Swiss-Prot record:
SUPFAM superfamilies: Ribosome-binding factor A, RbfA. Keywords: Cytoplasm, Ribosome biogenesis. Signal peptide: none annotated. One of its GO terms (biological process) is maturation of SSU-rRNA. It comes from Petrotoga mobilis (strain DSM 10674 / SJ95). This is Ribosome-binding factor A. It is found in: Cytoplasm.
């Protein structure tokens, strides 16, 4: 039952954070495509880890901007979800997409080498 509740909370928090992106006033985020790939709430519900990716090259800048605005996201969660303790929001760069691209390139390279034999 606890796992189901945590998954429901993660889903709802992901929606709220996505809505929060439109409330950010930072001009550096204008016209940036930001995608939330995964949201993980810690077992004690004190941390919410948000894994973000972007098609833009400056993902590290985007992560820094989001981490600087994490208080706004925490307030948004507190206003919309009733919880005893509102989790601290932490944004991370999602390495999964980059890793899959590297793996695909390696596979293509191996296939080309095998065809050349």
């Amino acid at each position: 039952m606890a796992q189901y509740r945590r998954e429901m909370l993660e889903s709802e928090m992901k929606k709220l954070i996505t809505q929060g992106f439109s409330q950010l006033k930072d001009p550096r985020l204008k016209d940036k495509f930001i995608d939330i790939n995964m949201v993980r709430l810690s077992k004690d519900k004190s941390y919410l880890d948000v894994y973000v990716s972007s098609l833009d090259e400056d993902i590290d800048t985007i992560i820094n901007i989001l981490n600087n605005a994490k208080g706004m996201f925490r307030t948004l969660i507190a206003k919309n979800i009733k919880m005893f303790k509102v989790p601290e929001v932490r944004f991370h760069k999602d390495e999964g997409i980059e890793a899959s691209i590297r793996i695909n390139k390696l596979i293509e390279k191996i296939e080309k080498n095998e065809e050349g034999k």
